Amino acid sequence: MVSNINQLLVQARTAYDAADWSSLIQYLQQLILGADSEHPEIVKNQEYLLTLTLSMLEMGDFQQRWEITKVLTHLGKIAIPPLIDILKDEDAEEELRWYAARTLGEFQHPEAIAPLVELLKTDEDEELKAIATTALGQMGTVAITSLTELLLDEDTRLLAVRSLSCIPQPETITPLLSVVQDPQAAIRAAAIEALSSFHDQRVPPVLLNALDDIAATVRRAAVLGLGFRPDLREALDLVTKLQPKLYDFNIDVCCAAAVSLSRMSCDDAAKHLFDLLISPQTPITLQLETIRALVWVGTPSSLEYLQTAFNQITSETLWQEIVTVLGRVQKPQTTLAVEILLQILQSQHPATEIANIKSAIALSLGQLGKMQAIEPLILLLADSNASVRLHAIAALKNLDSEAAHQKLQQLVNNAALTLDLHQGIAIALAEW
């Protein structure tokens, strides 16, 4: 064992002297990441291994540096002081300082907090400060006190909020609440977004208040945050509170409101979404978001609203979106979704003359997996458009490949079928 370790140490030194960084990484990984990393001989040579590892960090390329940081973290806290020195060295290569900051965050050690905090206060490199922000967030609860102090300084407040948002611990709630009324909209939005991940009684009143914030980014964060609390739907009358945001001045807020209402999973929410969808004043991007939201509501009424909307609107883009999202419906509403698609397919609706929409219907029927769609899909094999026929074949295979194949074989010699359907069935069987 000792001889093998000594051999690896010699090989590592030889690779270092030859500037063979790829080999050096391999030897260091075997020594430090291997099963024998706690062996007394390796522990005795830790300082030497640290020297080699740091030289690798300084001299390696991007990928080699990425790999060597894993070795550094396994060396333990002896690696922290030299990494701090690199971080503080303003003359050091930017990428090297980037790696030092990132690696310090992975240690989650109190010693690493102060230099990262100091960097946020004094350094002008925005990218490096972003890395330090993430690193502090990785440290978890040990960094909360230092980050809370950074909230007091206007210059570091936003970065501190971003770091706190990376720490999913309830201890961050109080410091985050302290900045929800900050003059800077970016800080208010970041704090509200972070608070939204906590099911704490102090948070919902803040989110409700922020619905009317002057800044759209803050309103959007509040809308999305409330969407994560369907458990409070009735207690806080969330559907009524969120509905006006469907008509916000900012379309991003409107889209967020559609998503959040969909999470309420109730008929009232579906009705509000339907009203928005069929309004002639609604921009098409918001209509598309609303169509998706109606599917996410997941109630029979929400799917029926989609069918009603399909018959009222005249946009080919919206028609296609409706038949596409119906294919993503989950149980227990899959049967209803299939029935709606089949009714559309068998109707005289102008959309059924459009190849792209027929293809989308076929695809959705295949995704829903209901056998009642087999015969209507077989009829699509007679379509004059090759894309429609191919989508019908794919859908039949997706439903039940064996059952569909048997059905086609039964029909292949049926003299009552049209020539187009005969040809379509023959092509489908050849594709099987």
PLM segments and residue spans:
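Short amphipathic alpha-helical interaction patches enriched in hydrophobic/aromatic residues
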Residues: 226, 326, 348-349, 415
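N-terminal "cap/leader" segments of large eukaryotic alpha-helical scaffolds
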Residues: 1-29, 35-36, 47-59, 66
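Short inter-helical turns and helix N-cap capping residues of alpha-solenoid HEAT/ARM repeat scaffolds
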Residues: 17-20, 60-61, 90-93, 123-125, ...
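Alpha-helical adaptor scaffolds
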Residues: 346-363, 375
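TPR/TPR-like (Sel1-like) alpha-helical repeat modules
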Residues: 29-33, 409-416
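Amphipathic alpha-helical scaffolding segments comprising HEAT/armadillo-like alpha-solenoid repeats
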Residues: 5-9, 40-58, 77-89, 109-122, ...
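Structural detector for internal amphipathic alpha-helices that build alpha-solenoid repeat scaffolds
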Residues: 10-14, 26-44, 64-77, 95-109, ...
